[in-house]
């Protein structure tokens, strides 16, 4: 079982959303994609943003997301910033 759970991660990610606004993530799939993308960044040499007892990039990515060290942005927002 994943700790924190998908539901816990979704609550953390959506915690800054104002009432009436669209949630940042609506599904577990979004969490999986975001953590996988961050894990690939770590594998490619990005520095972890949190201290972790784990050496696995995916575990580090999950922990970063849970501690709000990384934010999930939509592809539309990402393209606007480029």
Curated annotation (Swiss-Prot):
GO terms for molecular function: DNA binding; DNA-directed RNA polymerase activity. It is an enzyme of class 2 (transferase). Its EC number is 2.7.7.6. One of its GO terms (cellular component) is DNA-directed RNA polymerase complex. The keyword Cytoplasm does not apply. The keyword S-adenosyl-L-methionine does not apply. GO terms for biological process: DNA-templated transcription. InterPro entries: DNA-dir_RNA_pol_omega, Pol_omega/Rpo6/RPB6, RPB6/omega-like_sf. SUPFAM superfamilies: RPB6/omega subunit-like. It catalyses: RNA(n) + a ribonucleoside 5'-triphosphate = RNA(n+1) + diphosphate. Keywords: DNA-directed RNA polymerase, Nucleotidyltransferase, Transcription, Transferase. It comes from the Bacteria. It holds the Pfam family RNA_pol_Rpb6. SMART domains: RNA_pol_Rpb6. Belongs to the RNA polymerase subunit omega family. Promotes RNA polymerase assembly. Latches the N- and C-terminal regions of the beta' subunit thereby facilitating its interaction with the beta and alpha subunits. This is DNA-directed RNA polymerase subunit omega. It comes from Lachnoclostridium phytofermentans (strain ATCC 700394 / DSM 18823 / ISDg) (Clostridium phytofermentans).
């Amino acid at each position: 079982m994943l700790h924190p759970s998908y539901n816990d991660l979704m609550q953390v990610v959506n915690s800054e959303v104002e009432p009436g606004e669209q949630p940042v993530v609506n599904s577990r799939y979004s969490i999986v994609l975001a953590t996988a993308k961050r894990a690939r960044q770590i594998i490619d040499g990005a520095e972890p943003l949190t201290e972790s007892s784990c050496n696995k990039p995916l575990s580090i990515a999950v922990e970063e997301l849970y501690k709000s060290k990384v934010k999930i942005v939509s592809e539309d927002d990402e393209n606007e910033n480029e």
